[in-house]
Curated annotation (Swiss-Prot):
Polar residues bias spans: 17-31
Organism: Saccharomyces cerevisiae (strain ATCC 204508 / S288c) (Baker's yeast)
Keywords assigned by UniProt, alphabetized: Phosphoprotein
Pfam families: Endosulfine (PF04667)
GO terms assigned for molecular function: protein phosphatase inhibitor activity; protein serine/threonine phosphatase inhibitor activity
Protein name: mRNA stability protein IGO1
Similarity remark: Belongs to the endosulfine family.
Chain residue ranges for the region called Disordered: 1-31, 125-168
One GO cellular component, as annotated: nucleus
Comp. bias (Low complexity): 1-13, 127-139, 146-168
Residues modified to Phosphoserine: S32, S64
Post-translational modification: Phosphorylated at Ser-64 by RIM15.
Assembly: Interacts with RIM15, DHH1, PBP1, PBP4 and LSM12.
Amino acid sequence: MSNENLSPNSSNPDLTKLNNGESGTIDTSKFSPNEMKLYKMYGKLPSKKDIFKHTMQKRKYFDSGDYALQKAGIQNNDPINYGKNNLPLTNPSKLREDIIKRRISTCPSTASTAGVVDNATLIQKEGSISSGPPSSNNGTIGGGSTSSTPVGNHSSSSSSLYTESPIR
C-alpha cells in the first residue's frame, strides 16, 4: 500500500484501492453519505441496517428476572400483551379497572352484606381520625365521663382552675 492518509477524517481516500485481497471491487458510487462514512471508518458496511432492532429480535428475555423464571419453570400468567420486542404494552383503561376493583373489594363497608354493618366496623370507623369527632350520644368511646383532674404535680389550690363544665 502507499503512504496515503486512510483515517476516517481524511477527505479523499480512494476506497476502490482497498479491496483487501478480495477478487471483486466495491462500487462506492451507490453509497449514501452515511454508508460512505461507515465504510471509511470500518472498511466494510454493517450487515443489518437497524442494528438495535436486530439485537432486540435475538433477545429472548426482557431482564434477568424473566430468565430466572423460565429456568425455574414458572410461567407468567399476567394478562399483559407483549409487543414485538417483548416490552409490556400497558392498557390504561384495564389498569384503572383493576385498581378500582381492588379498592372496592378491600373496602370494609362493601364487604358486609346488603348494607348491614357489624359493630367492629362501626367502632373502627368512629375511632378513626378521618371520621371526625365522636358522636355526642350516650355511647361514647373511652369511658363516658371526662376527668377534670389537673395534670402533673400541681398544688391542690390550682385545682380550682379546672372545673367540671361540659364543653359545648
